[in-house]
Amino acid sequence: MFIAYLTAGAPDLNTTKQALLNLANDGADVIEIGVPYSDPLADGMILQKASQQALKNRFRLEQLWHLLAEIELPVPVVILAYYNQIFHYGVEKWVTTLVNLKVKALIVPDLPYEEAAILRAACARHHLHMIWLISPTTPKVRAKQLALACDDWIYLVSRTGVTGVDAHFDNQIPNMIAELKQVTTTPIALGFGIHQKQQLQLVKSWGADGVIIGTACMQILLEKGVDQLTEWISAMKKSSYP
């Protein structure tokens, strides 16, 4: 399972549209779209820059909704947003909007499971899946709880800290994958810092079912453009997760 991440509206909406279409048809099994935010706590410098660029261009949520309504992607779409964005938009309205746009799942990186009762209930009512992040610092009991709460796939964070192209993986990751597979059959995708083919092969050897590539995608898109990103993603996927 190869999951590609894009920040909506960075560097502009037309580029986002073309990148979504290209990746969905030539590489990605799932596309995760990040909603630009002024204070993205989980994001490293590159994704922060992407958000800032989109916001500087006066990005509005309605533009993303219109884009998703306009194009039909042949792969599942996951939206990543911070809870403040959802709260101000309206929880029920947010969930129903995503469902009407055929979005498959939602990730809210700054919302603890225990504080998400209202959002979880709304998602359950409207059959919108939720994906939770598990990190190397997550206690084992809690990690199992979160794994069982994930509907589509489990987002396993490769290390503590923020996103970025740091190649370091926490040494607990192989054991965490093995332990999670003992309690659930939900696919496990590893994210944060993945940008090299040898990393994909290593992650696959640990038993992970997929990878999430975000920072590297946005770095290539911002610096080299859509065509280079498409070629790179296609080559990366073929190397380990064809």
Curated annotation (Swiss-Prot):
CDD domains: Tryptophan_synthase_alpha
Main location: plastid
SUPFAM superfamilies assigned: Ribulose-phoshate binding barrel
Keywords: Amino-acid biosynthesis, Aromatic amino acid biosynthesis, Chloroplast, Lyase, Plastid, Tryptophan biosynthesis
GO cellular component, one term: cytosol
NCBIfam families: trpA
Alphabetized PANTHER family for the sequence: TRYPTOPHAN SYNTHASE ALPHA CHAIN, CHLOROPLASTIC, TRYPTOPHAN SYNTHASE, ALPHA CHAIN
UniProt-recorded name of the protein: Tryptophan synthase alpha chain
Organism annotation: Cyanidium caldarium
